[in-house]
Amino acid sequence: ITAEMRQRLCKMPFLAVNAQTNSSNIGFNLITLYPRADYIVIDEPEARLAAADRNNDIEDVMRKLSRNRCPIMVVTHGRHGAYGYERGFFMKLPAVSEHPVDTLGAGDAFFAITAPMAKTGTIHDLLLIGNAAGALKVQIPGHRQSVTKEALCEFIRAH
């Protein structure tokens, strides 16, 4: 994504961003390249890379990244759960995955289900529903199927 595209995106009334890092773009697709966002979801290594902070508490990393940039942020942390930040308030919810088979796409599932809710939902709701979507996704090998609304609702009711 180019700098011009990011600038145009940042003019949108509500911007949700999932700036992923992988082996082909490490260091070149950082969340810090976005001047602003309303909602960010990144994983713990992506947060630390963007903040250039390997050692401090994840809350300090999130505070540093959100400063004047984003009011709502989630940092996913695999089997450790997810951390949420909303205007100075931090929250952590544990992971709820029972039998992980393949972690590919768990963050995508988290972001896809929570981005439409981020404008009006609470950080607790975002973490709860996002963790549930991620937990369901890690039970699916590869991209054989998507997380369905029915499966998500059933999972949340059961937990």
What are these regions (language model features)?
Residues 1-103, 118-123, 127-132, 139-159:
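Ribokinase/PfkB-type carbohydrate-kinase core domain
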Residues 107:
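Short basic (Lys/Arg) and small-residue
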Residues 113-114:
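Flexible, glycine-rich loop/tail regions that form catalytic "lids" or insertion modules at the edges
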